[in-house]
Amino acid sequence: ECYAPSAGTGTLLMALSHQIGEERCTIFSQDISQRSNKMLKLNLLLNGLVSSLDNAIQGDTLVSPYHKSDDGQQLRQFDFVVSNPPFKMDFSDTREKIAAMPARFWAGVPNVPAKKKESMAIYTCFIQHVINSLKKTGKGAIVIPTGFITAKSGIENKILHKIVDDKVVFGCVSMPSNVFANTGTNVSVLFFDKSATADKVILIDASKLGEEYKDANGLKKVRLNDDEIEKIVGTFQRKEVVEDFSVAVTYDEIKEKGYSLSAGQYFDIKIDYVDITEEEFNNRMANYKQTLSEQFAESHRLEEEILKQLNALQFNSNIGSNE
């Protein structure tokens, strides 16, 4: 059973079903957009997933989740959950309704910004919903702003503590800028595994990969080639350590780093040493001293010039007078 709480047109669900096998996969989805839900149903038809048509629901997942347990009291839980939540959508009208469900949103609900209401960090609610919707052995993935993975306070930090302390987080891949069609925000993909069998978390910094191109609207985007995709996938699956690209760290190591899931914070700092003779050292030091002396002298000259100009200023009572 595969589920997407912010399904859109079903791109992630279709990719997931192809990996699992359409004949072995049942799709469940919900999306606030009626248009997107219609497109998703068309995708289900085209991809041989007709039996899942009735499971594609239009509605507000956070306020009124449709897919429930048999008794209707709890969220239904799934084997796989994927989500690409909205980053720019106004949820101010439903914020209080969401906040009235603390059992579901255990880390809290973000406040609505006074000016840009659409910039509310609603993705934090979807992270909590994804985790709640996973079976005890379930696996999940969600697209998030990269800033989340180094959060030091607020709801974001509470979630980081939860997923690390409970050993729910399996890995994190920081993607290049502008790699997703619907946002220019720097994003990462956060992976969950509720079985808690892994002893290490794989962190990948893929932000430097990809090549720039312009889309149909003339906007700059970045795309990954097949080799780069294979590098990310292969490294992730093998939990391979690659210099300046990936690390595999224990949960305790993550705690020591303040619960950061940024690969770059775990890379070894390299210091290159160059052998030089005593004569070369003395020459370099002499050059440094001469350069600094010249810069100090110029700074002193400028200070004197500024003081000279200030002393030359005089009060003029006629300035601003209408006479």
Where do the language-model regions lie?
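Conserved S-adenosyl-L-methionine
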Residues: 1-83, 88-92, 97-99, 144-147, ...
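A conserved structural/catalytic subdomain of Rossmann-like adenosyl-cofactor enzymes
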Residues: 75-323
